[in-house]
Regions:
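A conditional alpha-helix N-cap/helix-loop micro-motif detector
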Residues: 108-112, 139
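Short, charged beta->alpha transition segments
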Residues: 88-92, 113-120
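Generic beta-sheet signal
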Residues: 105, 131, 159-162
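Catalytic-site beta-strand/loop segments enriched in glycine and acidic/polar residues
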Residues: 117-153
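Membrane-anchoring hydrophobic helices of lipid-metabolizing enzymes
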Residues: 1-76, 92, 209-231
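Catalytic core of membrane glycerolipid acyltransferases/transacylases, capturing the structured
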Residues: 56-109, 153, 169
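A cross-family acyltransferase "interaction/gating" segment
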Residues: 3, 141-201
Length: 231
């Protein structure tokens, strides 16, 4: 562990960071092989399928879907923005074991550095992934970061939701989802959001709302496909 991390985290936190990522990786590497992903999409939308390399765009989803998203996209070579908090460090170490790279930053800390890191990924032809309401909510409310990245890079914003048929739902701000073994997971894609590179300052909020609406349509469609009532 680097000297900077020794200063940032307590002894207990450092022990957690040393042990927990490998346990989580082992458990969900096994459990993830039992999950059955079913992809649906709005008319005219070409989704990114499990096992294929993603395209040159920005994908957005709600923070509660991190675990199923990690398994679904593990072959995509995507780069994800993770906060600089302790929780972010923990998630980063888990994602590295699944083969991801992470850019550190968030809407609350290191945001500019994070956006520039993701822009570099997009400039190199890669895929960027955003937890749209992370790192601390409020739930189901998109932050401005994805829209700013789309405006900087000229790349479109994809909106999707992963809804397990059977899952444990944690009592956290995001109602974090842990899919149960052998469950079906619906991957629901909505229409893309295009953001002009010359978007004026007074146009950002409308684009944020457009992306938020797409994410909520994707979530509602997944719930309906499973016969669930939207929470």
């Amino acid at each position: 562990m680097s000297e900077s991390n020794k200063k940032r985290f307590s002894l207990t936190q450092r022990l957690v960071l040393a042990v927990v990522p490998r346990i989580v990786w082992a458990l969900f590497s096994i459990a993830g092989r039992t999950w059955r992903f079913e992809v649906i999409a709005e008319e005219g939308v070409e989704p990114c399928l499990q096992g294929q390399k993603s395209g040159n765009y920005i994908c957005c989803f709600w923070h509660q879907c991190v675990l199923p998203c990690t398994v679904y996209f593990c072959a995509s070579h995507a780069v994800i923005l993770i906060s600089q908090s302790f929780d972010g460090e923990l998630i980063t170490r888990i994602l590295r074991l699944f083969g991801y790279n992470a850019v550190r930053g968030s809407s609350t800390r290191g945001g500019r550095e994070g956006l520039l890191g993701l822009k570099h990924t997009l400039d190199q032809g890669g895929t960027a992934i955003f937890t749209a309401d992370g790192p601390v909510g409020p739930i189901y409310r998109t932050k401005m970061g994805p829209v700013k990245l789309a405006q900087l890079s000229g790349k479109p914003l994809g909106a999707f939701h992963l809804e397990p048929e059977h899952a444990w739902r944690l009592n956290s701000w995001d109602h974090f989802l842990i899919p149960k073994p052998f469950t079906r997971i619906v991957v629901s894609w909505a229409q893309w959001t295009e953001v002009p590179t010359d978007l004026p300052d007074d146009g950002f909020e409308a684009k944020r709302e457009e992306l938020n609406a797409a994410l909520e349509r994707a979530r509602a469609r997944a719930y309906a496909h499973l016969g669930k009532a939207v929470e």
